[in-house]
Amino acid sequence: MEPSPASGGSETTRLVSPRDRSSAGGGLRLKSLFTEPSEPLPEGPKLEGMAFHHCHKNRVSQSGLSPERAQARRQLYAACVVCFIFMAGEVVGGYLAHSLAIMTDAAHLLADIGSMMASLFSLWLSTRPATRTMTFGWHRSETLGALASVVSLWIVTGILLYLAFLRLLHSDYHIEAGAMLLTASIAVCANMIMAFVLHQTGAPHSHGPRGAEYAPLEEGHGHPLSLGNTSVRAAFVHVLGDLLQSLGVLAASILIYFKPQYKVADPISTFLFSICALGSTAPTLRDVLLVLMEGAPRSVEFEPVRDTLLSVPGVRATHDLHLWALTLTYHVASAHLAIDSTADPEAILAEASSRLYSRFGFSSCTLQVEKYRSEMAHCLRCREPPKA
């Protein structure tokens, strides 16, 4: 295994087949990128990936966090403070109003605090350097934090749905409509503030050094869509669900304030908007489970990556192409490239790496270069995987 620089400052690893090193008759001889070749390269089209930079150049702050992760940490800290203050107010207001809907909102805020604290811990853990055991570092801890955030909300919501169902069956409860209206109004303001804090409009992305995280490419578009840190995304979805519920609670409190006989609006609003909160977290849960199952990122399809590699001059075939992700924004690829015996392996490696980084935003690529053999066309292990 030999390191090879690639454009964009991302990490690239070159694997050279031993049989290609020792092939008789002048087999593949890899020319060093750091010394002048003994003889000039043959004339041919200039490859766009021939300009290199050192493979470990990146933009990481002294604290070990990339700018995007440092921003995510600040957002989560601010949201935690706002969430705790207004959660305490909702607990008091819900107790005074005897409102299950208000207590439901407070419970969701409590779940948000717990999930954001878990996200902050996972952000800290992800800055730890890679080890010989954890060779990719601790990036996956961010995904686990997002999973814990979603699961905690589902558990709390399930309990509150059960309590709301009991209130629909039994009407022996009283609600202080004035206290409920005031608390619901404050809750709406609190969730709007948290949504503003967590909203990531114009989060930076980079087409240069890969210290900045690439967000998944939006399906059908050619530019990366910056979703920011996974934990902030999960927290933002939480807050959106809470905001919808708070608006529903506010509407119910207005109705109960003017029409006390319609107090059943309290458990009904709890029931309806808890279901909405569950539905709003389903996409995040789906993405997190896909990452944990080592699935290909939803924004990167197999065929375009394969076709990009095959379009490199000198590449005859590709096999063992694998796409996966450590987080929603940290994408990884590996592949074997079978090339012509007369092709320059270094030039092909540079061009293939450059195209993968620039077109798909991979954070890490591992490419193995080997000489093309006719039996590869019939090899069962070299066949493409079937469509899911």
UniProtKB/Swiss-Prot annotation:
Please give the family membership noted in the entry: Belongs to the cation diffusion facilitator (CDF) transporter (TC 2.A.4) family. SLC30A subfamily.
MF terms from GO for this chain are: antiporter activity; metal ion binding; zinc ion transmembrane transporter activity
- Return the PANTHER family for the record: CATION EFFLUX PROTEIN/ ZINC TRANSPORTER (PTHR11562), PROTON-COUPLED ZINC ANTIPORTER SLC30A3-RELATED (PTHR11562:SF30)
Stated name of the protein: Probable proton-coupled zinc antiporter SLC30A3
Q: Describe its assembly.
A: Homodimer. Homodimerization could regulate efficiency of zinc transport. Interacts with TMEM163.
Q: Which domain of life is it from?
A: Eukaryota
The record's listing under SUPFAM superfamilies reads: Cation efflux protein cytoplasmic domain-like, Cation efflux protein transmembrane domain-like
Can the keyword Disulfide bond be found in this entry's annotation? no
**Can you tell me where the transmembrane regions are?**
76-96, 106-126, 146-166, 178-198, 236-256, 264-284
